[in-house]
Amino acid sequence: MSRLRLLIILFFISGFAVAQESVSHLPALDEASRVFEEGKDYFSYQEPITLPPRKDHRIPIQFFFDYDCRVCSSAQDILELYSQINRDRVVLTEYPVATAKTRFSATVFYSLQALNADNLSSALLFETAEKSQYTKLSQMDNLLTWLGRQGIERNRFLQTYTSEQIKQQVDEAVRLTEDYGVFTFPYVIIDGKYVLTASTLYNDDYALAVLDFLINKKQ
């Protein structure tokens, strides 16, 4: 190898090393390094909700949703991913938002649970993210047709939907919605104290970083 060629190679190698060193000293722009602010990135109850203690000491994350929701499906994906990554630290539970006059989502959700079709609840949440689709599928005949295509028999679903067991579960959903002051959806409560809404849950990296920040505060 000629001396000139060797010098050229060494020049490029040294230049690459300097560039690597310069990059390594750039400040990290990682979401995880941020300090998040109450009232901006998350909210807090003035009086935290008292939850029963868990024997496994995992922190509860309560996810309130509605099928008529543009952000709820992506929020569910974020929360499920976070709970899977941190299964030894947190436990995720889903609750449908319900009021005395708006019981549809809760009744459908608990009916699908009773039929061991939780996966269809998630599919329906995704399907109804668009307002036009929710308007369509909130009509029972259209919903039954959609469920039939997913393998749910019409009469079996209707029998479950109108059962006393489901009515009682929906009544409990109404109570929780009122007691927890759920005023929007998605609405996420962390350990009965911290609250996340669509303003945080619209972005996965941002939401995951805020979740980590709040869970670390609780431990």
Residues of each region from the PLM?
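Structural alpha/beta surface segment adjacent to cysteine/selenocysteine redox centers
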Residues: 70-144, 213
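Extracytoplasmic thiol/disulfide redox context detector
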Residues: 17-101, 174, 219
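Bacterial N-terminal signal peptides that target proteins for export
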Residues: 1-6
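N-proximal short alpha-helices
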Residues: 52-55, 98, 130, 143-146, ...
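Bacterial N-terminal signal peptides
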Residues: 7-15
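Generic anion/oxyanion-binding catalytic loop in active/binding sites
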Residues: 8, 97, 129-132, 146, ...
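C-terminal cap of thioredoxin/glutaredoxin-like
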Residues: 152-219
